[in-house]
Amino acid sequence: MIVMNKKEPNTTASLARRRFFQAGAALSAATLVTQGAQAAKSAHPDKVVSQEHWTTRDSDGVPIELFMWRKMIPGMINKASKGTILFVHGSSMAGTPVFDLQVPGKPQYSTMDHFARLGFDTWCLDNEGYCRSSKSRSINFNIANGADDLAAVSAYILKTTKQKQLMLYGLSSGALKAALFAERFPERVNRIALDAFVWTGEGSPTLENRRKRIGEWSGTNRRGIDRAMIQSIFTRDHPGTADADVVNAFADAILKLDSSVPTGSYVDMSINLPVCQPEKLKAPVMIMRGQFDGIASFKDLLNYFEKLPNPDKRFVVMPGVAHSSLHEKNLSIVYNVLESFFQEPSPVYVG
């Protein structure tokens, strides 16, 4: 069930989250922050506009509230949109800290602002179990459940934007959720970029270390997160790939929204891989692999890449990049490969 323009339930906790989120977002001088679909009508045509959106999906009679965050420039969207991008977050944080990070003096770290200014209609979500979306069910919110969220969110976005397809970018376990969703709903996906992806986990030092704590994570639906854990994302593979002020802003943004996150994707990536089948992914695909990223071996990714059926596919190695590419020093490289992929023209001749 898809509910158009659904508002967040008026619980005390949800109202507090909404007030905090609105206040934090308003600090960005470069962004006009408003609520609801009326924002586009009153905003300056050259300014990035922000909107909250909500939809609901049903799981065995239980309504699941899903939060979405949209950024775009109305004038560009109305006249010459380059398409709609849905950004999908990973295991340890919700959507906005990853894709709409506000760093003082460094506006480039808001990926959504960057692509909105290029003429894209950009969206991200909080998967069930994260931040503003529902957390009430007693499950660990695994990768398959995240793909269910994407089915509901994509239907809402396509109906709202009156588009037939959207583009996807998934980071880390977000890439697995995005790929699984694209396997299930190929008709909704125009192109898909999989960053910090892993297929079987063979040869992954990160997952080898993670398996040492699988007993702990298998026994609970949530795990705590703190500043040290977030900082370790930028040091575990190759220290120095990210600036300290960006890492600190990232940690601040995450911890203002959540103090714990689901264990499901950690469990899946540790002991349940593979969860994706490359033969079923029909859309054009770009695999993005940071030079220093320890989440997957080159062999594992190349084996997956070889089995992708669409000839429109890319395997990109990003030099000087580790796991969290959108928050690192070589961000311009990441943007360059994404811009090229998302704006690639359709082939005139296909044989």
Language-model regions: role of each:
Residues 294-300:
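Conserved alpha/beta-hydrolase "acid-adjacent" motif
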Residues 321-331:
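Catalytic histidine-centered segment of alpha/beta-hydrolase-like enzymes
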Residues 12-19, 29-42:
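N-terminal twin-arginine translocation
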Residues 77-81, 85-117:
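Short, surface-exposed "cap/lid" segments of acyl-processing enzymes
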Residues 207-288:
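Alpha/beta-hydrolase
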Residues 1-15, 26-29:
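N-terminal secretory signal peptides
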Residues 148-165:
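Conserved acidic catalytic loop of the alpha/beta-hydrolase fold
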Residues 42-77:
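N-terminal cap/lid segment of alpha/beta-hydrolase-fold proteins
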